Regions:
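N-terminal Rossmann-like NAD(P)+-binding domain of SDR-like oxidoreductases, especially those catalyzing
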Residues: 1-141
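NAD(P)-dependent short-chain dehydrogenase/reductase
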Residues: 99, 122-171
Length: 171
């Protein structure tokens, strides 16, 4: 969705002296200098979406979701950041044999997108074990509420219903 809508979501934070918006590509930026003085990093950046991750799109997803995360973990370690909170996805679960799943169930992603998010989770674990970078991965499902993505199901369904349009379903 549009960068203008994303910026509008930051409206409350942009006026704070405790918030600095840095727009940069994690694969290219000087991350160590950007992280100086930080004690916690909330890694929310990623290439989202399942459908476009197939075929030719996979290299872009690998680059944005795996390589960028590895670079951020390296910078976190080098800058002495205490903790990294990683935004993962429910897509890592894939097709499970039982529901609800439990922490000990082996993830089985069913899309290249899910594979990249799980690979980045494993990188977080490796940096925690080998370098002492405290990490936690949050496996988001469809996020609903204020500032939700306008291109996701909840928003599309309710917008269509309120406007009297048919609800489009996939799958």
């Amino acid at each position: 969705y549009s960068s203008a809508a994303k910026r509008q979501n930051l409206e409350g934070a942009l006026g704070s002296d405790r918030f600095t918006l840095v727009e940069a590509d994690l694969r290219e930026a000087d991350l160590v200098s950007l992280l100086e003085g930080c004690d916690t990093v909330f890694h929310q950046a990623a290439q989202p979406g399942v459908r476009l991750s197939w075929s030719d799109g996979f290299s872009e997803y690998s680059s944005h979701n795996v390589l960028a995360t590895q670079r951020l973990l390296e910078a976190t370690r080098a800058a002495g950041v205490r903790r990294l909170v990683y935004a993962s996805s429910s897509s890592v679960y894939g097709n499970q044999d039982r529901f609800p799943t439990v922490e000990t169930d082996l993830p089985r992603p069913y899309s290249p997108y899910g594979v990249t998010k799980l690979a980045a989770e494993h990188l977080c674990g490796l940096y925690a074990e080998n370098w002492g970078v405290s990490t936690v991965a949050l496996r988001y499902f469809t996020v609903f509420g204020p500032r939700q993505r306008p291109d996701m199901g909840f928003n599309r369904f309710f917008s269509a219903i309120l406007a009297g349009r048919p609800v489009v379903q996939y799958g």
